[in-house]
């Protein structure tokens, strides 16, 4: 059972990222996190999703169901919310988005723009430890407009991914590339990997030259995994989620994380550009992680927001910067890059949303 106040605090970033209308009304109705109870987190969000689904608003329903299973499935109510989320997204998606299954179905994803006749460069999209593929898959139509194929998948243990999260989980990304190699030009893969999946993408790029760039936001690098004093300040929800994903006891997870840390040698060995968005007041990721990237990675591009984890007050700016970063790494669509750069400068001149 999660702390309701902490759930509500974390929910704001994800609700804003999905443009969920009326999310504050749903949060106001939540007063507990007991599985299946009236007024509980999963029940209230599932009820909101069902009401939208009855009106034929399948994407909006999927977004509410996604919030209902947040941060991870820990009982029947959240399991039902996840099942409904995937089903609602499946009903919403058009013919241009297809379902994929990898590694015997242990890894699942949504894809667009795959073609054996005309394989395109691939944008591989992954969320962090609490965000599922259905949260990010709606952007696939925009990916194809950039002249790329896109695959959205999940970190191990997240959503429908049944793998455990281990120090070797980066290999999963290579497995996904292998699975679509016949229908995408995976030799030109660009990873848009948020938060903890950014760490996976950087580690994978050391061994898999098909990854040509990593665009990330608030990714752990070393300090998060090794600094016990910092870990004691990390929100309980984050540590509980990591314990769930790693299949480790809550009291033992901190002692296991040092195996994930990237060394100076590994960071210096990265021969690809890394685009890293830092939140200056991040309550999860230590501030020194961005400095490690800047000082060790050969080609590092940093963007900093005066904000908390995920920069909920800078969502539009982060989205534009992420698209710009992918195009910059590809050296593609120069006119669009210039337009994005101009839009970013205008946004950065405005006060942040609080």
Whereabouts are the PLM-identified features?
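Short alpha-helix in the alpha/beta-hydrolase fold that links the catalytic acid
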Residues: 272, 286-295, 306
